[in-house]
Amino acid sequence: MTKKKRENLGVALEIDGLEKKLSQCRRDLEVVNSRLCGVELSSEARRSLEKEKSSLMNKASNYEKELKLLRQENRKNMLLSVAIFLLLTVIYAYWAL
């Protein structure tokens, strides 16, 4: 996803979207695997399904890598939010005394 698009979406929404894409990709992969294991196929049909399977596996791998990065970014954002909250709490407590 481009940096411009990322700025418009929240990290949590991006994670949700990628999880949906990954889930769909895994379902498609299961369908391809069941077709490969099922009926006798011609060598051309088998090659086509193997190619599709490879493509889906690469896509799933890329989605997983991007999800990992987004989760790390989300974790950093959460820690930053907690740090700001604690800082404001300390400032308020000092001011209130």
UniProtKB/Swiss-Prot annotation:
Chain ranges passing through the membrane: 77-97
Domain of life of the source: Eukaryota
Location relative to the cell: Membrane
UniProt keywords, alphabetically: Coiled coil, Membrane, Transmembrane, Transmembrane helix
UniProt xrefs under InterPro entries: CCDC-167
Protein's UniProt keywords contain Membrane: yes
Main location: membrane
Membrane topology: Single-pass membrane protein
One CC-aspect GO term: membrane
Coiled-coil region list: 10-79
Protein's recorded name: Coiled-coil domain-containing protein 167
